[in-house]
Design a protein with these regions (language model features):
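Beta-lactam-recognizing serine transpeptidase/beta-lactamase-like catalytic domain environment
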Residues: 78, 84, 125, 224-234, ...
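Intrinsically disordered, low-complexity charged/polar segments
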Residues: 502-506, 629-636
Length: 704
């Protein structure tokens, strides 16, 4: 049985002590309250103002404007336009009943908002005290100006009732922001790319240069000073820098016109996977071989930059909308990717000029050497055929290029050897990024001296067995025909601030000289023979000396790793004028939608059409005569041949100052730093100075 706990009792002495402590605490509290009351009466206003002066009022962000993207002539490809968000302070409207209807009517009439929904929003229990309700986004400057004009009409023009109505519009204010606009819609879409409302760049220049295009937001602060007066402090935004690209919208439009024409011409083929298109990919690059500047770059996967998630031109939009996010990402990536820089494939015979250049430069062959083609070569018991299985017979080096002879190239490769072949692949920058200022550049894949054997060497000589991108090939080919100088291809000429001042100029970058001018001269002659008499005849342009090379590559089935019977990438790369090239055009057609993909000369003809328009546009004169019979052979009328044509004897148009008016820049200012070719570099040194694909930042510019 538990004992009962006795109640604890304080003795009288302890009770007196507790009472004393309680009395003391009570006295202190009374004194503190009296002190607070005294301070409040005597100095309350002073301290209230000090508190108010430390409190922030009416603080807002002032958004920066993202920089523009222009072509080389100042045509705007991307820009940011100021827009406004309509904000409503419901609490301010509810201060008086008289404010409700005038405010609702002003919003409804000026911005097309529903009056019933507005009344409900303003008076609803959960929003009536809200001071921040977004009513409408992306309101234009014109809409905002019209609203402000409607509530600032002079009293002289209004009745008393209308004045009261106007003065009772309360709680409406605006926040500034910017939206990205693309005035030329889909033009150069895979190059320009797009950005979202948060100024995050997606693909293209918008992505690569996003840190340069972006600026820094400003801020406006409002404070009450000690006199309870509102003072404002404004930190202005720093707008983003703008890009002056190397693109020429006129050349870009010409290129895209003929891509579209070919896409439509072949669209009736039987390949249902192409969704009514003429080929899986059709792509063209136009470059200045003397500077590395890209005049045009386009594919048949263009899309409206203002509506990039609309992929209905290639896919069933309803089916895409039903996919998971991961599956949609695959579709969008396929649509937005740039075939010219991100897709690596076997080049085929367009690589042959590089093999011959290397053999000539190393002395492995001489320009006057001859080779006998019997239609095939046996390489370690493996028979490798020439395209002409009956053989071309005896050929010179130039004729081997003209005839696109695999047999002769294998013999040349044997003389060159594995070590030198691999070295010159690297010297021409295959297997490495070119450093072009676009994201997601593919480096392709090469054999090394360790894993390349006789068969691999033989097939590599004519562009089979390794992969390359279009940008790698056109940069290398430009070096073959321009005297031997390898320039880094680039997309941006200048970076400018929002006042138009130049922040940075991207001068041409000469990386190396893999071959001599004398070797380049031999290749110029061989490539011209290929257009006049060989496989590139369909690329002939009346009045101009054109040199070029065709290419046909059987694709690899990614599932089996074997040759994909009947599926080809066909191409043509050409320079004009071939004796002193000002422009190089590279056209690729991936799986044309026809029964026999190797026939038809589609890229050759497309290249010819492009050159026929851009050569006169670039003020490059026609120097060669031609006959009606020659025109008829290629299905060209004399009117087409002479449209826009200029000759060396014609006087160019000049301005009032006597300066020649040029419709496009075919040259850039002389750069004393690149007038002489650099000394030959080691393999490691060749990679130095080649930027990675991370993109340039504002900090990079500030550090220069």
């Amino acid at each position: 049985m538990k004992k009962r706990r006795r109640k604890q009792k304080f003795d009288k002495q302890m009770q007196k002590k507790l009472l004393g402590v309680f009395a003391f605490v009570l006295l202190v509290l009374v004194i503190l309250n009296l002190k607070i009351a005294y301070i409040n009466i005597k100095s309350g206003d002073k301290y209230a103002k000090q508190v108010l002066s430390q409190k922030e009022y009416d603080s807002r962000t002032i958004p920066y404007r993202r920089g523009e993207i222009q072509d080389r002539n100042g045509n705007v490809l991307a820009r940011s336009e100021k827009v406004y968000t309509v904000i409503l302070d419901c609490k301010a409207v509810n201060e008086k009943e008289a404010y409700l209807e005038p405010t609702v009517q002003a919003l409804a009439s000026s911005f097309g908002l529903d009056a019933v929904k507005l009344r409900s929003l303003i008076t609803a229990e959960d929003t009536k005290n809200s001071q921040y309700q977004v009513l409408k986004k992306k309101v234009t400057q014109e809409e905002k100006d019209a609203y402000e004009a409607s509530i600032s009409t002079s009293d002289e023009n209004l009745t008393k009732e209308e004045i009261n109505q106007r003065n009772n519009v309360k709680g409406i204010w605006f926040e500034e922001s910017y939206v990205r606009e693309y005035p030329m819609k889909s033009l150069a879409s895979t190059v320009v790319g797009f950005s979202n409302d948060l100024s995050d760049g997606f693909v293209g220049l918008e992505s690569y240069y996003t840190d340069v295009l972006n600026g820094v937001n400003g801020r406006e602060f409002g404070y009450l000073n000690e006199d309870s007066e509102l003072q404002r402090t404004v930190i202005e935004p720093e707008n983003g820098y703008s890009l002056v690209s190397t693109l020429d919208v006129n050349i870009q439009q010409i290129v895209e016109k003929y891509i579209k024409q070919l896409d439509e011409e072949l669209s009736d083929g039987s390949n249902q996977e192409l969704n009514g298109h003429g080929a899986k990919n059709i792509a063209v690059i136009v470059i200045n071989p003397k500077t590395g500047e890209i005049y045009a770059m386009a594919t048949n996967h263009g899309y409206d930059l203002s509506d990039p998630y609309n992929v209905s031109s290639w896919y069933d939009q309803d089916e895409v909308d039903a996919l998971s996010e991961e599956e949609q990402a695959v579709v969008y990536n396929d649509m937005w990717s740039n075939f010219c820089v991100s897709y690596a494939f076997e080049l085929g015979s367009t690589f042959k000029p590089i093999t011959v250049s290397a053999a000539l430069e190393t002395g492995s062959i001489n320009p006057d050497d001859t080779f006998y083609c019997d239609g095939y070569e046996f390489i370690t018991d493996t028979r490798i055929n020439c395209d002409n299985i009956n053989g071309h017979g005896m050929e010179t080096v130039r004729e081997a290029i003209q005839n696109s002879c695999n047999d002769a190239l294998m013999q040349i490769g044997y003389r060159l050897g594995v070590e030198k072949f691999c070295k010159y692949q690297r010297l021409f920058n295959f297997g490495s990024r070119t450093g072009i200022d676009l994201p997601n550049e593919n480096i392709g894949s090469l054999y090394t001296t360790e894993n390349m054997h006789e068969v691999e060497l033989a097939t590599n000589t004519f562009g089979q067995g390794f992969t390359s991108t279009m940008i790698q090939e056109i940069a290398a080919f430009s070096a073959v025909v321009n005297g031997g100088y390898y320039y880094q291809p680039h997309m941006v000429k200048q970076i400018i601030n929002d006042q138009g001042g130049v922040v940075k100029t991207n001068d041409p970058i000469l990386l190396r000289q893999p071959i001599s001018e004398s070797t380049s001269k031999v290749l110029q002659e061989a490539l011209e023979m290929g257009v006049l008499y060989g496989t590139g005849k369909k690329a002939w342009v009346p009045g101009y000396r054109i040199g070029g090379k065709t290419g046909t590559a059987e694709k690899i089935n990614p599932e089996t790793g074997q040759r994909w019977s009947g599926r080809y990438i066909v191409s043509f790369i050409g320079a004009a004028p071939i004796d002193d090239p000002e422009v190089v055009v590279y056209s690729v057609v991936d799986e044309p939608n026809v029964e026999d993909q190797t026939q038809g000369g589609y890229p050759h003809i497309m290249s010819r059409k492009i050159l026929m328009e851009i050569l006169p546009y670039l003020n490059i004169p026609a120097t060669e005569e031609y006959t009606d019979e020659e025109l008829a052979e290629y299905g060209i009328t004399r009117e087409e041949a002479e449209a826009g044509r200029i000759t060396e004897t014609e006087t160019p148009e000049t301005d009032e100052n006597g300066n020649v008016i040029q419709s496009a820049d075919s040259q850039v200012a002389d750069n004393p730093n690149i007038s002489n070719p650099p000394a030959e570099k080691t393999d490691e040194e060749q990679q130095e100075g080649l930027p990675d694909n991370a993109g340039i930042t504002r900090e990079d510019l500030a550090a220069e």
